[in-house]
Swiss-Prot record:
Keywords: Cell inner membrane, Cell membrane, Hydrogen ion transport, Ion transport, Membrane, Transmembrane, Transmembrane helix, Transport. Its main location: membrane. This is Proton extrusion protein PxcA. Belongs to the CemA family. The lineage of its organism: Bacteria, Bacillati, Cyanobacteriota, Cyanophyceae, Synechococcales. It comes from the Bacteria. GO terms for molecular function: proton transmembrane transporter activity. InterPro entries: CemA (IPR004282). Disruption phenotype: Loss of light-induced proton extrusion, grows poorly at low pH or in low Na(+) medium. Relaxed light-induced H(+) extrusion activity. H(+) influx activity is also partially diminished. The double mutant missing both PxcA and PxcL is impaired for light-induced H(+) extrusion and later exhibits lower H(+) uptake activity. The double mutant missing both PxcA and FlpA has both reduced light-induced H(+) extrusion and later lower H(+) uptake activity. Required for H(+) efflux immediately after light irradiation to form a rapid H(+) concentration gradient across the thylakoid membranes. Together with PxcL, contributes to transient H(+) uptake following dark to light transition. Involved in light-induced Na(+)-dependent proton extrusion. Also seems to be involved in CO(2) transport. It comes from Synechocystis sp. (strain ATCC 27184 / PCC 6803 / Kazusa). It is found in: Cell inner membrane. It holds the Pfam family CemA. Disulfide bonds: none annotated. It is a multi-pass membrane protein.
């Protein structure tokens, strides 16, 4: 197999498995660069490069940290693809391919952003005081650990790096001067406010706000569409097409009442209970004494009522099976035709999740794990399985229920723990530490 064929196969593989991670990391790096250009004059995010308040700088620092974590996660996925590493170590002649050059340029841009914040991540909160008068600098510890992880991950692939002569980190001694920096920042702010071009900055802020509002509205609209469209498909197909067809079948076959033996047993028990209640009331003198013919007539009326009731249950169960199939088709069509909305929704969810504090993340993880795989979860699973069986008209099988409850929550718990160990530990180590402390 020659080098050209190998390169074509590797490129196709890369396009399927790694290009998505690279594109997401590149987009996050572009967002960091956009924030720097719009609000920090193209410099590193920090209070020394702007005249904003501490709360505003904290907001931007939170945004930068969220994008950096996203980049680190995607780079971790790239490093796990050995074929991707091989592509980057090909012969220089192969690297002249336009697609390869485009990939290398993206990696170069991402690496520049990571190097810029590798020395010191933006601090979003001051050190916390502890009881003995010491200082517990958790953000600095987390940043140190994260920098070590970043270095190990970037060692997985090598590519050409240019010298970053435009971005230089100034030390505190280099920044010091005759006038205080706060006074200089005030002068810069006044100059910027008096600048005739300051309206451009206002337009950029307004545009960013409109984009955020549009993203929120589109995400909520898409979620509602995912819920409403399948429900409408289910109800419309069931009411206007399926129920009339199934009812006509039962009318033509009047002897068919039950679709499983469990329904038949329940109907017999209900009729027996009615007969015993008649005899009980008769013995206590609560009603007139019925003749055998009258009692048989009442039992016949009750049997007819019970048969009609269970026939409706059987009709709905059969119609539900086909209606759910139509709902699944409608749901799939919405997903296939809404790729852009899916990307926006993913970004919206990422912003919400990354915006939560570590305590909130740990609380949600504990809530969901205890709800679905916790000590009291078997009772909830029993209710869910019984509801599904009634929905489709299936007989309730206790053996299957016990087997499901004994295996599925265990598998789900394993998946949760693997996700926490594999992904959450690399994205937010402090959230994992908080989760462990709260769980204990």
């Amino acid at each position: 197999m020659d080098l050209t064929n190998w390169w074509q196969g590797a490129t196709q593989w890369f396009g399927r498995s790694s290009q998505k991670s690279l594109e997401q990391a590149f987009r996050s790096a572009l967002k960091i660069k956009e924030i720097e250009d719009q609000y920090f004059q193209g410099k590193k995010i920090g209070p020394e490069n702007c005249d904003y308040s501490a709360d505003t700088v904290t907001y931007f620092a939170n945004q930068i940290q969220r994008h950096l974590r996203k980049i680190e996660q995607e780079i971790y996925h790239l490093n796990s693809d050995q074929e991707f590493v091989k592509i980057l170590s090909l012969d220089p002649a192969v690297k002249q391919d336009p697609q390869t050059e485009y990939v290398l340029n993206q990696l170069q841009f991402i690496d520049d952003i990571l190097q810029r914040y590798d020395g010191e991540l933006p601090q979003v909160s001051p050190p916390k005081q502890i009881a003995n008068g010491g200082v517990l600098d958790l953000p600095a510890i987390t940043a140190n650990k994260q920098r070590q992880i970043n270095k190990k991950r970037r060692d997985g692939f090598q590519y050409i790096r240019r010298e970053d002569t435009q971005q230089k980190v100034d030390t505190a001694t280099q920044k010091s001067g005759v006038l205080p920096r706060s006074f200089l920042r005030t002068i810069d702010r006044l100059k910027r406010e008096m600048d005739p071009q300051s309206s451009d900055t206002e337009q950029k802020v307004l545009k960013q706000y409109r984009n955020s509002r549009y993203k929120t509205a589109l995400s909520i609209k898409f979620v509602l569409t995912l819920i409403i469209v399948p429900l409408l498909a289910h109800q419309l197909t069931k009411t206007f097409f399926l129920l009339p067809s199934v009812e006509s079948f039962f009318e033509r076959n009047s002897e068919v009442v039950f679709i499983n033996q469990s329904m038949e047993t329940e109907a017999y028990e209900e009729l027996s209970h009615f007969e015993e209640s008649l005899r009980f009331r008769e013995l206590l003198g609560f009603g007139e004494k019925l003749s055998p013919e009258a009692k048989e007539e009442k039992l016949a009326e009750k049997a007819k009522e019970i048969s009609e009731s269970y026939r409706r249950v059987s009709t709905n169960a059969i119609a539900n099976i086909f209606a759910d199939i139509f709902s699944l088709v409608a749901f799939s069509l919405v997903l296939v035709n809404s790729q852009r909305e899916i990307e926006v929704l993913k970004e919206f969810i990422d912003e919400i999740v990354y915006g939560l504090s570590d305590s909130a993340k740990a609380f949600l993880i504990i809530l969901f794990t205890d709800m679905f795989v916790g000590f009291h979860s078997p009772h909830g699973w029993e209710v869910i399985l019984a509801s599904i069986a009634r929905h489709f008209g299936l007989p309730e099988n206790q053996d299957f229920n016990f087997l499901f409850i004994a295996t599925f929550p265990v598998i789900l718990d394993t998946v949760f723990k693997y996700w926490i160990f594999r992904y959450l530990n690399s994205i937010s180590p402090s959230a994992v530490a908080t989760y462990r402390n709260m769980n204990e």
